Amino acid sequence: MMFTPLIVLTLLVLATAEHQCGPNEQWSGCPKCELQSGESDKPCATICGEPKCYCSPDKYRRIPDGRCIRKIQCPQH
């Protein structure tokens, strides 16, 4: 029980820490969908995904380097 305050404090710090995302990315504690370059638009899930940085809504994840780019920069354009 001595460690309970330490665990609570650690979880609080992790939950409120500022997340550094890359260009054209934003942090979401509940991402639902991320488009990938070269894929056709697909329906988004209605449940939360793993909290992470994901591409802004108008951007696509480019494979293999993982950058978020505009649709016109995708390979099929």
From Swiss-Prot:
Gene3D superfamilies noted in UniProt: Laminin
Disulfide bonds, which pairs? Answer: 21-53, 30-48, 33-44, 55-68
Q: What range(s) does the TIL domain occupy?
A: 21-74
Q: Where is the signal peptide?
A: 1-17
Record GO cellular component, one term: extracellular region
Q: What is its main location?
A: secreted
Q: Where is this chain's protein located in or outside the cell?
A: Secreted
Q: Which domain of life is it from?
A: Eukaryota
- Indicate the annotated site residue(s) for Reactive bond: 46-47
A GO term for molecular function: serine-type endopeptidase inhibitor activity
Q: Which InterPro entries match?
A: Ser_inhib-like_sf
Protein keywords: Disulfide bond, Protease inhibitor, Secreted, Serine protease inhibitor, Signal
This molecule's function is given as: Defends the organism against the host's proteinases.
- What name does this protein carry? Serine protease inhibitor 3
**What is the species of this protein?**
Anisakis simplex
Q: What taxonomic classification does the UniProt entry list for its organism? A: Eukaryota, Metazoa, Ecdysozoa, Nematoda, Chromadorea
